[in-house]
């Protein structure tokens, strides 16, 4: 409570608890704030500036599927399914760690494998398209095969070690080469052991060398899809060469539309076989006769064209002769027309002036009529006023007479 001696002073609140305001935090909070401030100002703490908008744009439309995840504890031997990890590790952008050649190679191999699978799905799901500008599944398969061939030609086995397994284009050939090299090494070891009298290397049961063969079904699918792509490419080349469209058909391929490929080949073969030496002589003789007839037709056509041109020239000459008589009088006609044009312009101006005078005369007549009516009204009012004045004067005279009496 406040001191009683300040109870009756103005501006002092009474019957209220005392309040002492300060900008400092309570003592407990002050100690915690100082410790947090020291921790934030320490050099051991890495301060990262995070842009919320950039982070939102980075992870926009990204999601993690948790449909088949199970992180619960297990009592059986089967392992619970958590988040699945990939075959290789992708480094985040801006992490400051440089990607090693081994990681780059594994990433490229896995990406090309995924690309091949996507191309196979597209080839099985989509239909054939006639658009040449669009990237077709056949072109995608060819580009994927070229990328794999580039990876194989890089000879990364000797550079990256045995972990970099390259079995992309010919896994069977790679396994066969590896088996042959191991057999030769084993033969060399056997011959060395027999010559030196030393113990042979440890073998499998019954002294048989054991090999492990790993099948790659995805590689078989890829080779099959590559063969299909090559077949489709060759068929596309045949279609462009033989072509079923009217714009692609030549003189040899005319009349083969709608037939099968074998029938088309037989028809083309028959047409080509018809062009032998004996038939060519006959065709040449016929062409010579046709050429002579064409020359005669051209001569007759030239004479007919000359006759037509002569008739047209004569018609033009007659027209010019008719116009010679009129050409002498044409300047006079032109001068007369120019003079008549000036007269027409003056007459038009005079007509405009007459219409203006007519309108002004009508306005004056209307104003005179209005003035005459006003004058009659003024005259009538003046007469009425004179009569009233005369009556007033007569009344005034009578009153004066009465006053004089």
Swiss-Prot record:
Signal peptide: none annotated. It holds the Pfam family Dynamitin. It comes from the Eukaryota. It is found in: Cytoplasm, Cytoskeleton, Microtubule organizing center, Centrosome; Membrane; Cytoplasm, Cytoskeleton. Residues 1-24 are annotated as: Disordered. It is a peripheral membrane protein. Residues 102-125, 379-405 form a coiled coil. InterPro entries: Dynamitin (IPR028133). GO terms for cellular component: centrosome; cytoplasm; dynactin complex; dynein complex; membrane; microtubule; vesicle. Its main location: cytoplasm. GO terms for biological process: auditory receptor cell development; establishment or maintenance of apical/basal cell polarity; eye photoreceptor cell differentiation; glial cell differentiation; mitotic spindle organization; nuclear migration; P granule organization; photoreceptor cell maintenance. Keywords: Coiled coil, Cytoplasm, Cytoskeleton, Dynein, Membrane, Microtubule. Belongs to the dynactin subunit 2 family. Subunit of dynactin, a multiprotein complex part of a tripartite complex with dynein and a adapter, such as BICDL1, BICD2 or HOOK3. The dynactin complex is built around ACTR1A/ACTB filament and consists of an actin-related filament composed of a shoulder domain, a pointed end and a barbed end. Its length is defined by its flexible shoulder domain. The soulder is composed of 2 DCTN1 subunits, 4 DCTN2 and 2 DCTN3. Part of the dynactin complex that activates the molecular motor dynein for ultra-processive transport along microtubules. In the dynactin soulder domain, binds the ACTR1A filament and acts as a molecular ruler to determine the length. Modulates cytoplasmic dynein binding to an organelle, and plays a role in prometaphase chromosome alignment and spindle organization during mitosis. Involved in anchoring microtubules to centrosomes. This is Dynactin subunit 2. It comes from Danio rerio.
